[in-house]
């Protein structure tokens, strides 16, 4: 909408009505006058033609043209100002006489088919008006009915046509229009004068007031509106002047307050400067105190761990001696208290590192599912001891090969699940892992830990992530702890680029969840066992706990199995199944041997019975296997444990391997290099059955010398060897002219993601993980045999993963499997392990007494390799843990409990081996 000024609006409001009314009146006057003039002209013509018609009756009767001509000429001259011509027509519509022969008389004549007028008629054509009237004989009576043809009537003598000129009327009309326009312009001028005067009386004062208000806006508060004004303008003037006076008074008061506040602020700033100096000094003192405190906590925590590890270790050793029940109870109490104290010290040490910003996260490739499976397995013992069902559900779309810090991720899970176990008396603890976001290089995962514990009151939830604070002071008295676990967890999650939160309701449980960002490792090193052999098989699944059942059903849905689920064994449809998975409730405390009838019935219903056992029931695993149970799995069931057990069923169905393409030994010359005699003997025994020529070397130097002497079709190279490692030996061998194309296969026990790429980049052709399985070795030989081509496809038997009980001291079936089913070889491998144990024991004992012997990590590595072929999974895992800790920089004195446990396990292995070796 257009914004007009007040002057323009006033002019429009004044002139518009005046112009509109004047224009309407002028139009009305001109139109009325125009019609009036035409009517006057028509009346004048009628006053001429009607008497003339009466006067010409006699002349027409006598056909006297002269008399009629004189008569119309006189009338024409008398009225020449308006008359252009007068014409008389006879009864035959022929011109009888006219007063103006210069005009065309035909324009005044009636048409041939037009009847004679019976009375006066008027027609107009432009500036011409024609009047016609009949000449009637005196014998004619108007009362007579007219004949159908006026021309043939005896009383109609003709008619007179009078042509009038309208130009004179037009001139008069123009004069009237001019007069009206002049009068309207005069009125508009008068209105303009009055409007201008009104605008001057209104806009002038308003402009004065606007200027005054503008001066007030610019700060000239002494400005006032001057001059005489009328009515409302005077009221407005007084209002503006009053407002200016109020503003001036307010401004004066405000200025006074500002001056006073400025003075006070200046004094305050001076005081704040003094306080800032004092605060800066206090801050420096506090930072120095915090630094000293952090160093003190870190140093004291480290110093306390060393003697505490000795207390724990010697307590465990004492527990293995003959003790009275009271002494054993006291020692158990000492061990539990020492373990709790060690956990507290570890928390304080981690907290100190986080506070000091000295905790550095690793960025290494690792398998996510195996990492989570490992930590959940460790936590399952304490969960099952309390009768709590622990479940782990990793969604299938979560990537497994990631890069990050697996130990810190396990620490986060341990803290959260440990709290859930601590504050839950019955029910479930469920762990859910989902993918939240995925890109080409990163994945964000969400981990939820849900429990059915006591919950956290809303008033205490704000204190949950504060250091050395717990939701309730009585918690530390009932359950122990320092209040650092969640603080450390939060800081670790933040360091991983994530966040943590929770939701809790008293007496209904809590749900903690966190998000972390992990890099994706595009190189898949270890793949899960193939489940194609399960196609068409039926599996019966019995599990009373719905959450545990759902997790397992999610795993089974990724296989081609047909699954029949029942919450109870009695409700299971009676039929014969290929496999049966029977879940034992964690609250079940009776010996499983007492369930003989139930287990016997289950065995009769299936070809392969598997039991999902809580930790406290694992003591019956070996006895159950002897009674016909196919596999005993530890709860919670995860893909890393369940899928190999399922594919073990396929392995049992295969009595022998599928035949290879050549029934005889492969025409190959293979060299195996390993510094461990047990490993070298096993590899040699396996190769003797597969290839024609085998060369064995126990060092990298010997392998290089042997490679100089003869060509090889394939070389199996151990990586970690003294003096010269496998990578350096591979480089030297490939420098030989006749060995440049010889494939070298890396053989190592470190089956970690990223290891294969490192080895391939160093010149290795392929990768073979320890312990070496006969099937995998045979497949490798077929792939690299001369003439086959590395890219050629070889029909090989399906390789199934070995189902291993990680807590077994000696698994003879596993030892036989690792020795390719050769009993003598398995016994030799076990005996070589026993012969090697005294050397390891001496080194470990030297370390425990503080002598710090050299080569401990290499010796543990060698023992780790020997355990991989001797069927001792517990000692193998323990060696792997100690080796990883030592290689990651952990000091030997910090591993005292693990070393003592290793000594105990050596005794256990020797005791179990004596039963087999005799």
Swiss-Prot record:
The modification Phosphohistidine is found at residues 302, 861. Residues 822-918 form the HPt domain. Disulfide bonds: none annotated. Its main location: membrane. The keyword Hydrolase does not apply. Residues 200-252 form the HAMP domain. Its EC number is 2.7.13.3. Residues 32-176 are periplasmic. Autophosphorylated. Activation requires a sequential transfer of a phosphate group from a His in the primary transmitter domain, to an Asp in the receiver domain and to a His in the secondary transmitter domain. Residues 1-9, 197-918 are cytoplasmic. GO terms for molecular function: ATP binding; histidine phosphotransfer kinase activity; phosphoprotein phosphatase activity; phosphorelay sensor kinase activity; protein histidine kinase activity; protein homodimerization activity. Member of the two-component regulatory system UvrY/BarA involved in the regulation of carbon metabolism via the CsrA/CsrB regulatory system. Phosphorylates UvrY, probably via a four-step phosphorelay. This is Signal transduction histidine-protein kinase BarA. It comes from Escherichia coli (strain K12). The lineage of its organism: Bacteria, Pseudomonadati, Pseudomonadota, Gammaproteobacteria, Enterobacterales.
């Amino acid at each position: 909408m257009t914004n007009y000024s007040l002057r323009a609006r006033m002019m429009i409001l004044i002139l518009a009505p005046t112009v509109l009314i004047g224009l309407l009146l002028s139009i009305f006057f001109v139109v009325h006058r125009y019609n009036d003039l035409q009517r006057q002209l028509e009346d004048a013509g009628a006053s001429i033609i009607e008497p003339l018609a009466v006067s010409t009756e006699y002349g027409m009767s006598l056909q006297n043209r002269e008399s009629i001509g004189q008569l119309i000429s006189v009338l024409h001259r008398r009225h020449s100002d308006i008359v252009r011509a007068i014409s008389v027509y006879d009864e035959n519509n022929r011109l009888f006489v006219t007063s103006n022969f210069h005009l065309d008389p035909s324009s005044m004549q009636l048409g041939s088919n037009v009847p004679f007028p019976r009375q006066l008629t008027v027609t107009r054509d432009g500036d011409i008006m024609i009047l016609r009237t009949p000449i009637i004989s005196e014998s004619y009576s108007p009362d007579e009915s007219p004949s159908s043809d006026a021309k043939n009537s005896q009383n109609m003598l003709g008619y007179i046509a009078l042509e009038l000129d309208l130009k004179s009327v037009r001139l008069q009309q123009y004069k009237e229009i001019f007069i009206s326009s002049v009068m309207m312009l005069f009125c508009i001028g008068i209105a303009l004068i009055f409007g201008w005067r009104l605008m001057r009386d209104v806009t002038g004062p308003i402009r004065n007031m606007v200027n005054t208000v503008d001066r007030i806006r610019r700060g000239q508060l002494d400005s006032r509106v001057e001059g005489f004004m009328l009515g409302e303008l005077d009221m407005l003037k007084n209002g503006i002047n009053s407002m200016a006076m109020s503003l001036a008074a307010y401004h004066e008061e405000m200025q006074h307050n500002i001056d006073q506040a400025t003075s006070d602020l200046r004094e305050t700033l001076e005081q704040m400067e003094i306080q800032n100096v004092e605060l800066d000094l206090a801050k420096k003192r506090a930072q120095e105190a915090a630094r000293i405190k952090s160093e003190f906590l870190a140093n004291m925590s480290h110093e306390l761990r060393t003697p505490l590890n000795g207390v724990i270790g010697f307590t465990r050793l004492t527990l293995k001696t003959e003790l009275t029940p009271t002494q054993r109870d006291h020692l158990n109490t000492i061990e539990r208290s020492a373990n709790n104290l060690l956990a507290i010290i570890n928390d304080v040490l981690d907290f100190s590192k986080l506070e000091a910003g000295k905790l550095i996260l690793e960025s290494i490739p690792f398998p996510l599912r195996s990492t989570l499976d490992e930590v959940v397995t460790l936590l399952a013992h304490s969960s099952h001891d309390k009768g709590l069902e622990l479940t782990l559900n990793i969604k299938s779309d979560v990537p497994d090969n990631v890069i990050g810090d697996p130990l810190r991720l396990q620490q986060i899970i341990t803290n959260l699940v440990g709290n859930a176990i601590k504050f839950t008396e019955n029910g479930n603890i469920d762990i859910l892992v989902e993918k939240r976001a995925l890109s080409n290089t990163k994945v964000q995962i969400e981990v939820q830990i849900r429990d059915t514990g006591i919950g956290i009151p809303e008033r205490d939830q704000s204190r949950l992530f504060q250091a050395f604070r717990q939701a309730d002071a009585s918690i530390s008295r009932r359950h122990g702890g320092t209040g650092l676990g969640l603080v450390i967890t939060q800081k670790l999650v933040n360091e991983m680029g994530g966040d943590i939160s929770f939701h809790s309701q008293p007496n209904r449980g809590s749900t903690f969840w966190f998000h972390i960002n992990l890099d994706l490792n595009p190189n898949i090193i270890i793949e899960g066992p193939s489940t194609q052999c399960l196609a068409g098989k039926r599996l019966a699944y019995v599990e009373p706990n719905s959450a545990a059942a759902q997790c397992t059903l999610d795993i089974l849905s990724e296989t081609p199995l047909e699954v029949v689920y029942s919450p109870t064994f009695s409700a299971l449809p009676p039929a014969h199944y290929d496999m049966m998975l029977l879940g034992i409730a964690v609250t079940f405390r009776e010996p499983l041997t007492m369930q003989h009838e139930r287990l016997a019935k289950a065995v009769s219903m299936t070809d392969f019975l598997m039991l999902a056992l809580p930790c406290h029931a694992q003591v019956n695993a070996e006895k159950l296997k002897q009674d016909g149970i196919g596999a005993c799995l530890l709860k919670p069931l995860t893909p890393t444990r369940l899928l190999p057990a399922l594919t073990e069923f396929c392995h049992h169905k295969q009595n022998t391997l599928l035949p290879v393409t050549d029934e005889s030994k492969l025409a190959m010359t293979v060299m195996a290099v390993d510094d461990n005699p047990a490993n070298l003997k096993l590899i040699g025994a396996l190769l003797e059955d597969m290839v024609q020529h085998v060369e064995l070397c126990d060092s990298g130097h010997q392998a290089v010398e042997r490679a100089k002497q003869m060509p090889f079709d394939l070389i199996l190279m151990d990586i970690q060897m003294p003096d010269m490692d496998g990578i350096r030996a591979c480089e030297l061998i490939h420098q030989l002219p006749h060995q440049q194309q010889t494939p070298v296969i890396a053989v190592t026990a470190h089956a970690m993601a990223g290891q294969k790429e490192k080895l391939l980049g160093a010149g290795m052709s392929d990768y073979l993980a320890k312990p070496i399985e006969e099937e995998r070795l045979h497949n490798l030989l077929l792939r690299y045999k001369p003439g086959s081509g590395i890219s050629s496809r070889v029909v090989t038997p399906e390789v199934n993963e070995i189902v291993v009980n990680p807590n077994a001291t000696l698994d003879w079936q596993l030892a036989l499997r690792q020795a390719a089913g050769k009993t003598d070889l398995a016994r030799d491998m076990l005996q070589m392990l026993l012969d090697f144990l005294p050397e390891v024991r001496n080194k470990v004992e030297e370390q425990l007494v503080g002598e710090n012997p050299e080569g401990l990590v290499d010796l543990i590595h060698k023992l780790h390799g020997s355990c991989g072929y001797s069927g001792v999974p517990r000692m193998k895992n323990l060696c792997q843990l100690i080796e990883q800790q030592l290689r990651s920089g952990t000091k030997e004195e910090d591993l005292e409990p693990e070393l003592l446990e290793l000594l105990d396990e050596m005794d256990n292995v020797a005791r179990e081996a004596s039963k087999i070796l005799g």
